[in-house]
């Protein structure tokens, strides 16, 4: 198979809100600007210069607890048209008076906020030269109180707004994580696949926190590498139980995935919340720009079960390392539905670009092909 380049550029829709509490916004009549589209701030905004601040400032209810003048917030959305864009905020200043700067493209406007109850504040008119993804950026310039402002919604309209795409509040968690990108492989017809090999290279600068570069996926599990934090990276191998539940404590004994053996410094534990089963991981500081190799074996075992064994090769180690061998009861099969994917599992980095190259894939069947 040829090398495939998967760009993962998440441009969503966002908005910012800030302050100390969340009140029901006051409805207002709009006279001057066309502000017919309401984008929920909490589902579509990020503090783009600080992941830690994002977790503090952005919530499902909007942007609150916004205190730092260094925070840069962006709300993403997609339009079907270009032209004049009207912008307004449903905003309040919890205490004192604040001045904010709002930027679209190369044009910025400064607005003073002093109202203590939510109201729609017109920001102004901007121009966007093309359809597609855009963002509205806001930064605090001055404040007399603790908080800069609370923003519940971003409102847009004007000729540039034909149809608009953004994340609704009820989809905030997955919307802020961004879309996952999946790639399937054509398998040899009528053959039982026992081994599945793949190589993974993450370009330098594309290894954002929250990335899961999943190399060897199949019908019953997945195997790849993650960026878990600024200081921790993992090689992860997981197998789902055949029992359908998100709570691993609900799995009957005869459906529980068994750990047959695991490699050195590998942690094996139950997992849930996305189906349930057994996961194994090795903390390993893999590097962007380096090619890593993943090898997975799947074959029927005793009493209607299947054994899955995962091996990982890092050039800096120079030898294959066993991650784990896991047995899935109530299933007798070989490897099937082979695929790879790239996803983000940290909502506060869902606006960040990430890429991966998968290459040199091959499979080996029980017939020796």
Per-range role (PLM):
Residues 24-285, 293-369:
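Extracytoplasmic
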Residues 3, 8-9, 13-36:
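Bacterial Sec-dependent N-terminal signal peptides
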